[in-house]
Amino acid sequence: MIALARDVQEFPDAYQAERARRPGVSEKGIGHALRRMNISYKKTLRHPKADEDKRHTFQETIKAYKAQNRVIVYSDESGFAHDMPRTHGYAPIGKRCHGVFNWHARGRVNVIGALISKCLLTVGLFKSNIDADTFFGWTIQDLLPKLPPASVVVMDNATFHKRQDIQNAITQAGHTLEYLPAYSPHLNPIEHKWAQAKAIRKQQNQTVEQLFKIESFYVT
């Protein structure tokens, strides 16, 4: 058991056959032993360019802001396709399930949002692609008027987020701007809100405009 635990630690993503080959035992035997040791098969992929030190520094920085009772506001963009094709359905065994797909329902609505805790502070909907000008306009007209005083605004390090007039608008309004470390979307909780919104839209068969009228999404 000790040798197997060491093997798992050294080769966490080895295939069962590879793990069995080293000590010369069967794959089935390795499988039983792993279950007895409460070791399960899973994997978390990490971007090869991600910097764990920078991620740690960012998390400590956010923790320090929270200790000062600063409001953390996470911002991000996402896209919502107009069509929501139902790729699977029910039919008697042995028979096909046929559906209808609107091949002309193309395009998407792009959204920019800001999140406080687990609730949206504001959302902007755009039929065009989001670029620096669009983001600047949303920041000035929508985000800044709604931010609590001395907020900490967090966004990813997309090039257009770093345009000087966007940075100036936020900091000159008395807020602090922080950028996520590269390749670290999991550190932005608004990503989970977008996933939740897309799941609800599919369940309730709503348009994007209807979806973002749901009051429970927002800060009250």
Q: What annotation goes with each model-predicted range?
A:
Residues 1-220:
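Short functional hotspots at interaction and active-site rims
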